[in-house]
């Protein structure tokens, strides 16, 4: 009987409803999401390139920011392309294995980003509270180890939840009232009692949220105490410029995750869940590079330096109707 249930599950087919309730908005939404995703890709890959080519940004803080841009690019690229396709085609079906693969990679990168924000908070804490020991405390070896650990933890959490999803059983054809394969949506469709799977999802999400927020809040509590002891206003401004971008990104990302996964589903309508999911799967990956570029002096200086090089500056080239020559 177990084999029969496993075969039924593996052969199950799902239809992603997405935004089919709003047929008149399908095309406008397609172009809006395409633009947002396009700018997100350019912003995150651009941030990676800027950090790579500018030696001044080869510090632990920008090493972690580099990985944040990579993670944002990855998890938005797992969701956005399929969402865009489903906005313009009638066949929105996906197999159970396809659903599971999408969820696994998406969950891996989302959990990785949660831990990464906590690591970045600790990095800010050491830089501000122990500046003389910063290069010793946050060494290249430690940075590499932390990155390996946070990716490994993301994979471990995803693997645990994916294995729990393998135990779910479905009847043939199913409809997911979402635009991607979210585990809570799959659990709600399974026909035996799926309480344990729901409990596991809630436990993993809550544990990651509480542990990372505890690290973040503790780090910033020490940062605030240290800042209040600084006699000069310039020191306060420097701390603010260092932490403002990170705090803004944390507030947006963690607020959305808490709303979606650490509140009982019954308290949120499916429409509200979809809107919040769009925000953290498509919009947040666009906002992060903007936040870190517009509110970060070092990044703005790096961008300005690139623009002002002889290859980009208008004063260093003469334009002709069919060609241009760059002055040496």
Curated annotation (Swiss-Prot):
It is a multi-pass membrane protein. It is found in: Cell membrane. One of its GO terms (biological process) is sensory perception of smell. One of its GO terms (cellular component) is plasma membrane. Glycans are attached at residue 7. Residues 1-27, 78-101, 163-198, 261-273 are extracellular. InterPro entries: GPCR_Rhodpsn, GPCR_Rhodpsn_7TM, Olfact_rcpt. Disulfide bonds: none annotated. Gene3D superfamilies: Rhodopsin 7-helix transmembrane proteins (1.20.1070.10). Keywords: Cell membrane, G-protein coupled receptor, Glycoprotein, Membrane, Olfaction, Receptor, Sensory transduction, Transducer, Transmembrane, Transmembrane helix. Its main location: membrane. One of its GO terms (molecular function) is olfactory receptor activity. Residues 49-56, 123-141, 220-239, 295-328 are cytoplasmic. The chain crosses the membrane at residues 28-48, 57-77, 102-122, 142-162, 199-219, 240-260, 274-294. Belongs to the G-protein coupled receptor 1 family. Odorant receptor. This is Olfactory receptor 5D16. The gene is OR5D16.
């Amino acid at each position: 009987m177990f084999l029969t249930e496993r075969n039924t599950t593996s052969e199950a087919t799902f239809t992603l409803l997405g935004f089919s309730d709003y047929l008149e908005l399908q095309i406008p939404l397609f172009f809006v999401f395409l633009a947002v995703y396009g700018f997100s890709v350019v912003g995150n890959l651009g941030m990676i390139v800027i950090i790579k080519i500018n030696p001044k940004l080869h510090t632990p803080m920008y090493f972690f920011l580099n990985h944040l841009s990579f993670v944002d690019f990855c998890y938005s690229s797992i969701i956005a392309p399929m969402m865009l396709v489903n906005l313009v085609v009638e066949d929105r079906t996906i197999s159970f294995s396809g659903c599971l693969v999408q969820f696994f990679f998406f969950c891996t990168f989302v959990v990785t980003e949660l831990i990464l924000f906590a690591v970045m908070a600790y990095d800010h804490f050491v830089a501000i509270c122990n500046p003389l020991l910063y290069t010793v405390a946050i060494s290249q070896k430690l940075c590499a180890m932390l990155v390996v650990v946070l990716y490994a933890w993301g994979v471990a959490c995803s693997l645990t939840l994916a294995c729990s999803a393998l135990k779910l059983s479905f009847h043939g054809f199913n409809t997911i009232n979402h635009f991607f394969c979210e585990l809570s949506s799959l659990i709600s469709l399974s026909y035996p009692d799926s309480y344990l799977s729901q409990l596991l999802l809630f436990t993993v999400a809550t544990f990651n949220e509480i542990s990372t927020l505890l690290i973040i809040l503790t780090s910033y509590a020490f940062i605030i105490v240290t800042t209040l002891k600084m006699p000069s206003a310039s020191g306060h401004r420097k701390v603010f410029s260092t932490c403002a971008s990170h705090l803004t990104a944390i507030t947006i990302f963690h607020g959305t995750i808490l709303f979606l996964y650490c509140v009982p589903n019954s308290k949120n309508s499916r429409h509200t869940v979809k809107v919040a999911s769009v925000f953290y799967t498509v919009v947040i990956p666009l906002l992060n590079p903007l936040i870190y570029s517009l509110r970060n002096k070092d990044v703005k200086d790096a961008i300005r330096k690139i623009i002002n090089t002889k290859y980009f500056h208008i004063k260093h080239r003469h334009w002709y109707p069919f060609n241009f020559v760059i002055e040496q």
